[in-house]
């Protein structure tokens, strides 16, 4: 393990950081993350951790992963308002879009060198560190273990390639009994338990608190299609053929939510509609679709996608034509939407996808022609 960490710190990380510097010149998202990590230690130095009884550090890769621990953070703060919560992120989608009064400090996770991780953890001295899903970093974990800081993995799923990292956690909270049994058979840890998928609690809470809901009979009559978490591949295979087909006439409205909210993608959708003289509207706040005259709606903000499903009748979830795999399909299913997605669902959402397919609530497609059917 020590040898692997040395190779990682002395060879792999410098190469990764060098490439990040180069790519950041051309990619705004990479640049924001890189500059944010440069400021992380300074932010930790300025943070007054002494005024809190204990510090709990939560790390999530992105906005979606943070939502999986959001309920836990709220419960911790409610049970003891004197504790401090630090939330760290890898992606700008998490850092920029998570706005939660329960968080006392929000940062990018510092560069994963052993010395940097040691400096960060000695400054804060957290009582516990929570990692969400699969975004865990070797040096940070190693240092936490050596400083006797309790490390907890939430929303855990077993993958053999993660085995070396899974052995570094003190407590592992699995999303399913199957994952739990695989963990117990393959790693050295007796503190493994099933807590279920925390996304479900959050989904139900969002649905219950949604302001705008359309009754099921109206949803069925006035069909509203939502294309959610759309990647470039989804645009090429589904979106472009859809807007050139007669299928659009079957829908009262069509909502488009890009996976990455950026001006580049918004301009792409706007241009596509303008070329065809289609009326469209770009929205950046949660609102009632019934009050919008335009047929095509482009969503230009994250944070309320799960609530939009209550106003739609059919959902296409993107990612299934890309290497990353499909995104959250439970949210639209919970809102009684049939869910359509591409062929690549062998990621962390595999069990959800297969479960929906088995009960005819989900449909995997390989082309737009199948989508039309």
Name each model-derived stretch:
Residues 77, 145-146, 274, 333, ...:
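Anion (oxyanion) recognition and catalysis
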Residues 116, 161, 265, 300, ...:
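Short acidic active-site motifs
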Residues 169, 310-373:
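Catalytic binding pocket for nucleotide-activated donors in carbohydrate/polymer assembly enzymes
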Residues 149-151, 280, 339:
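Hydrophobic beta-strand scaffold residues
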Residues 124-128, 292-324:
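Acidic donor-binding loop of glycosyltransferase active sites
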Residues 75, 81, 86-90, 95, ...:
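Donor-nucleotide binding loops and adjacent catalytic segments primarily
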Residues 20, 24-207, 226, 230-232, ...:
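Active-site and donor-binding regions of nucleotide-sugar-utilizing enzymes
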């Amino acid at each position: 393990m020590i040898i692997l960490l040395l190779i990682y710190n002395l060879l792999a990380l410098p190469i990764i950081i060098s490439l990040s510097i180069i790519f950041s010149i051309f990619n705004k998202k990479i640049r924001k993350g890189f500059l944010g990590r440069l400021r992380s230690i300074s932010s930790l130095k300025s943070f007054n951790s002494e005024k809190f009884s204990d510090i709990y550090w939560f790390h999530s890769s992105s906005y979606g992963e943070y939502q999986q621990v959001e309920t836990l953070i709220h419960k911790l703060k409610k049970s003891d308002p004197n504790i401090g919560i630090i939330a760290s992120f890898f992606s700008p989608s998490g850092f920029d879009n998570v706005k939660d009064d329960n968080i006392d400090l929000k940062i990018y996770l510092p560069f994963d060198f052993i010395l940097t991780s040691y400096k960060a953890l000695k400054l804060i001295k957290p009582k516990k560190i929570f990692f969400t899903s699969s975004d865990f970093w070797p040096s940070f974990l190693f240092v936490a273990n050596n400083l006797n800081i309790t490390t907890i993995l939430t929303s855990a799923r077993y993958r053999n390639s993660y085995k070396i990292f899974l052995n570094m956690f003190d407590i592992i909270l699995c999303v399913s009994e199957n994952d739990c049994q695989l963990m117990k058979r393959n790693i050295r840890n007796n503190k493994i338990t099933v807590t279920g998928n925390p996304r479900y609690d959050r989904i139900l809470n969002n649905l219950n608190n949604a302001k705008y809901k359309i009754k099921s009979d109206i949803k069925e009559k006035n069909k509203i299609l939502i294309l959610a978490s759309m990647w470039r591949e989804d645009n090429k295979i589904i979106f472009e053929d859809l807007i050139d087909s007669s299928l659009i006439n079957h829908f009262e409205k069509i909502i488009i939510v890009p996976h990455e909210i950026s001006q580049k993608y918004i301009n792409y959708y706007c241009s596509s509609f303008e070329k065809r003289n289609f009326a469209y509207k770009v929205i950046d706040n949660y609102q009632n679709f019934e009050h919008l005259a335009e047929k095509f709606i482009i969503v230009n903000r994250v944070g309320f996608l799960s609530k939009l499903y209550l106003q739609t009748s059919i959902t296409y979830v993107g990612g299934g034509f890309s290497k990353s795999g499909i995104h959250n399909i439970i949210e639209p299913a919970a809102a009684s939407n049939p869910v359509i997605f591409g062929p690549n669902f062998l990621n962390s959402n595999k069990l959800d996808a297969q479960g929906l397919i088995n009960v005819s609530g989900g449909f995997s497609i390989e082309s737009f022609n199948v989508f039309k059917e």
